[in-house]
Structures are given as structure tokens and as C-alpha cells.
Amino acid sequence: FTFVIDKLDQDETGNALNSASALAREVRQVVIPEVDTYTYNKMVTGAGTKPDAITLTKDNIYTEIIKAGNALDNAEVPETERVLVVTPDVHLLMKQCADITMETDIGNDMRLKGVISNLDGATVVKVPAARMPKDFGFMLCHKVATVAPTKLEDYKVHQDPPGINGTLIEGRICYDAFVLENKAKAIYYQANKPAV
């Protein structure tokens, strides 16, 4: 990416528009979402266990998540460092599920803090639906299954380059993600069939 902050614009905003904040915003709002979207799509595509899509509800969400945990257990995936990736809509279902909120230690913690952060030994990570494939339900995974190398990540800020009265900001990031074939069973992906 490349963009310019003109000196006049910077001056008129009382220095609120400056190169450091603009670069940080670009990384936060563009680069990170793009890399996340790419990596999550690779993980979903390469998941070793993908049962048929079902309609997730507050009544079945807990059962489906512990089924995923059972599948990872049977595939001999380490129990530590598992991550449950959910969208805000699925997280809402989890909060509405009596099996989670009323009958578990997690429920006690949630009532105190108002958030579900761990379920069935997995850290719960809520990711915006826009970064996930269409009809994403949830994904239970372990870090051994995916590698996401960043080959190059370089950002430059040039003050008054030729032809520009201001700051030229450039960034370049080269990345990829791979699901290791022999570790694919460490990813369980459940698609969510929209309710009719």
C-alpha cells in the first residue's frame, strides 16, 4: 500500500493526521483483517474434520462444541492450547445456552465477568463475521495444524520525497498460510446452515 499525507492536511487537523497514526490505522484496519481472513479461509478449507452443515441454536451449540472436542481427542490432538474460533452471532448463542451459562464453572466465570473466554479446555476467540467464510459456524483447532509465515513485512515513511509536499507512507507485506496435511485433523470446522 502507498498513500500520502499532505502537509496542509496535517496542519489543518492540528497534527491529528500524522504518519504514525495513519500507518497504525492502515495496519489495524486493512493489513490485519486481510491476513486474518486469508488464514482463516485456509484453515476452513484444509480442516481435517468437516461434518455436514447444521443450524446452530442455543439448544445445540454446547453439544456440537463438545463433539468437536471429542473428535480432536480421538485424533490425539494435544488438549492444551486449543482454540475455539466463533463469530459474534455464535458467541451470542453460547451466552444464551443454559448448558454453558448455568451448569459449568465457565458459567460462573461468565456471570462474574460477562464473557465466555474458555470452554471445554479451549480458549474462545471471537472474530468478526466479515473475516470468516460465508455460513461459518465455529472452528476448534490447535496451533500445530497451521503455519502462517510472514516472509516480508516492511513499512517506510518518507518525509518530503520529490514531487510531494508532505509524507509518503508505504507498506509491503508478503504472507501465506498452510494447513499441514498430517496435522489437518487438529482442525474441526462446523458450518452453520442458515435457519429457514
Residue ranges and their predicted role:
Residues 14, 97-196:
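Sequence/fold signature of self-assembling virion shell proteins
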Residues 32, 89, 174:
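Residue-level marker of positions within ordered structural domains that often coincide
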Residues 21, 80, 163-167:
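Residues at beta-strand starts and edge strands
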Residues 36-40, 78-81, 178-179:
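Intrinsically disordered or highly flexible coil/loop and linker segments, enriched in small
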Residues 1-4:
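Short amphipathic
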Residues 7-75, 188-196:
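Alpha-helical scaffold segments that mediate packing/assembly in large oligomeric complexes
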Residues 47-115:
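Extended, solvent-exposed, turn-rich assembly/linker loops in the middle of proteins
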